[in-house]
A protein has these predicted regions:
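Short, conserved beta-strand/beta-arch hydrophobic-aromatic motifs that form part
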Residues: 39-100
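Charge-rich, low-complexity N-terminal segments
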Residues: 1-41, 45-46, 90
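Intrinsic-disorder-associated interaction segments
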Residues: 4, 15-18, 81, 109, ...
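Short, Lys/Arg-enriched charge-dense amphipathic segments
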Residues: 1, 57-71, 107-109, 121-128
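Well-ordered alpha/beta subsegment
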Residues: 92-128
């Protein structure tokens, strides 16, 4: 059953201290437009768009969150060229590829604002 959209405070309480990392990202990256959506499978989740282009998905969980980005082949090539992170490259190489791209997930413990900023910049560059 679909419930009403959660408030920022409710999400912060559910996620816990790690919510501060996500909030920092929202304040650091210019132009992110967020929108709450609901699905039967995932419950409430937030999307992040820049200039009407989907950049990420944020799934709040009890005591943490999952942050997902979907990368095109072009973006993955740029990530490899920039040598962003071995962990990111290995995860993308082992992830299942879909028509819309290759998903990459970070949990709250793995989420680093600087890393995600770099991934967002590469994703935007690959969409030009």
């Amino acid at each position: 059953m679909r419930t009403k959209q959660p408030s920022q405070k409710e999400i912060a309480v559910k996620v816990g201290d790690d919510y501060k990392k996500y909030d920092r990202l929202l304040k650091k990256v210019a132009g992110i437009k967020t929108d709450w959506k609901h699905s039967k499978r995932s419950g409430w989740f937030q999307t992040g768009d820049i200039k009407k282009k989907r950049i990420y998905y944020f799934f709040p969980e009890e005591g943490g969150f999952k942050f997902t980005m979907v990368f095109s082949d072009k973006a993955i090539q740029l990530i490899k060229e920039e040598n962003i992170s071995d962990m990111v490259i290995q995860a993308l190489e082992s992830a299942k590829k879909y028509h819309e791209g290759t998903p990459f997930d970070l949990n709250a413990a793995e989420f680093e604002v600087k890393l995600v900023e770099s991934l967002i910049a590469i994703k935007l560059q690959s969409m030009k």
